[in-house]
C-alpha cells in the first residue's frame, strides 16, 4: 500500500508503532502531522520507499486502540490520565537530574549546558497549558460545545508549536539525547527520561491536534 500521500498524523494513529518509526527518522507527526509522508521524507532527504516498506511491516500488527473512533469524553479522560498526570511527574524529576548533572559535570565539554533552564521553561509552559485545557477547553468539548471552541483550540495549537520548538532546543542541547561515553548513571537515566518525555509529549500533541480538536470543531 502507498503511504506517501497520507498525512503523518493519520499514519501515526492508524499504524502500530508508526510514531516510534517517525521519531527514529526525526519526522514531526504531532505539530507537523498534516504534512504528507512524501513531503516529510523529502524535507529530511530520506528515501520514502524505505519508510513505506517499514510502515507496511508495522501495519501487519493489530492496533491496540483506535482513538480516531473513540468517544471524545473517553479521549479527554485518557489524555489527562495518560499524558497530563505523567508530564506532571516527569518534568520535576528531570529538572532535579539536570540540575545535578550540570553542577557536578560543569567542567566537562559534553555537559548539556542550559538543559535545566529549558526543562524548567517546558514545565512552566506545559503546567499552564494543561490547566487551561482541563479547566476551560475540555469541559466545553464534553458539554458538546466543541464547535464553538475555535479560539481556545487555536491557542492550544499555538502552545503545542511552542512546546515542539522547546523539544527541538532540548534535543540540540543534549546531542539528540545521546549520552557521551563518560556519562554517569544519573546522566544516562536523565536522557532515558527525556526520550520517554519526548515520545509521550509527541503522542499527546498528536492525539489532540489530529483527533480531538478536529472532531470537536466538527461538532461532535
Curated annotation (Swiss-Prot):
Effect of a null allele: Mutants show a severe growth impairment under nitrosative and oxidative stress conditions. Mutation increases the sensitivity of the bacterium to iron starvation, increases the intracellular levels of free iron, and decreases the activity of several iron-sulfur-containing proteins.
**Inducing stimuli:** Induced by nitric oxide. Negatively regulated by Fnr and Fur, but no obvious Fnr or Fur binding sites were found, suggesting that this regulation could be indirect.
CDD domains in the record: Hr-like (cd12108)
Q: Which GO terms describe its biological process?
A: protein repair; response to nitrosative stress; response to oxidative stress
Keywords (A to Z) from UniProt: Cytoplasm, Iron, Metal-binding, Stress response
Q: Taxonomically, which superkingdom?
A: Bacteria
Any one GO molecular function term:
iron ion binding
Gene Ontology cellular-component terms listed: cytosol
Location in or out of the cell: Cytoplasm
A family per Pfam? Hemerythrin
List the InterPro entries.
Answer: FeS-repair_YftE, Hemerythrin-like, RIC_family
Q: What does this protein do?
A: Di-iron-containing protein involved in the repair of iron-sulfur clusters damaged by oxidative and nitrosative stress conditions.
Q: Which PANTHER family does the entry link to?
A: IRON-SULFUR CLUSTER REPAIR PROTEIN YTFE
Indicate the quaternary assembly: Homodimer.
Family, similarity comment:
Belongs to the RIC family. YtfE subfamily.
Q: What is the name of this protein?
A: Iron-sulfur cluster repair protein YtfE
At the highest ranks, the source species' classification is: Bacteria, Pseudomonadati, Pseudomonadota, Gammaproteobacteria, Enterobacterales
Which gene name does the record give? ytfE
Amino acid at each position: 500500500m502507498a503511504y506517501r500521500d497520507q498525512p503523518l498524523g493519520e499514519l501515526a494513529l492508524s499504524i502500530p508503532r508508526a510514531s516510534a518509526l517517525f521519531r527514529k527518522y526525526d519526522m514531526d507527526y504531532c505539530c507537523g502531522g498534516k504534512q504528507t509522508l512524501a513531503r516529510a521524507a523529502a524535507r529530511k532527504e530520506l528515501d520514502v520507499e524505505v519508510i513505506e516498506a517499514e510502515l507496511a511491516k508495522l501495519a501487519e500488527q493489530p492496533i491496540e486502540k483506535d482513538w480516531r473512533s473513540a468517544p471524545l469524553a473517553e479521549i479527554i479522560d485518557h489524555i489527562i490520565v495518560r499524558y497530563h498526570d505523567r508530564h506532571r511527574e516527569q518534568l520535576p524529576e528531570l529538572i532535579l537530574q539536570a540540575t545535578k548533572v550540570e553542577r557536578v559535570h560543569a567542567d566537562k565539554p559534553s555537559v548539556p549546558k542550559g538543559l535545566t533552564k529549558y526543562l524548567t521553561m517546558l514545565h512552566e509552559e506545559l503546567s499552564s497549558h494543561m490547566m487551561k485545557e482541563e479547566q476551560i477547553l475540555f469541559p466545553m468539548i464534553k458539554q458538546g460545545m466543541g464547535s464553538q471552541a475555535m479560539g481556545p483550540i487555536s491557542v492550544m495549537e499555538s502552545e503545542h508549536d511552542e512546546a515542539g520548538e522547546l523539544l527541538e532546543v532540548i534535543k540540540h542541547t543534549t546531542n539528540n539525547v545521546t549520552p557521551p561515553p563518560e556519562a554517569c548513571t544519573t546522566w544516562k537515566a536523565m536522557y532515558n527520561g527525556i526520550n520517554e518525555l519526548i515520545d509521550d509529549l509527541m503522542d499527546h500533541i498528536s492525539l489532540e491536534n489530529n483527533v480531538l480538536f478536529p472532531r470537536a470543531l466538527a461538532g461532535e
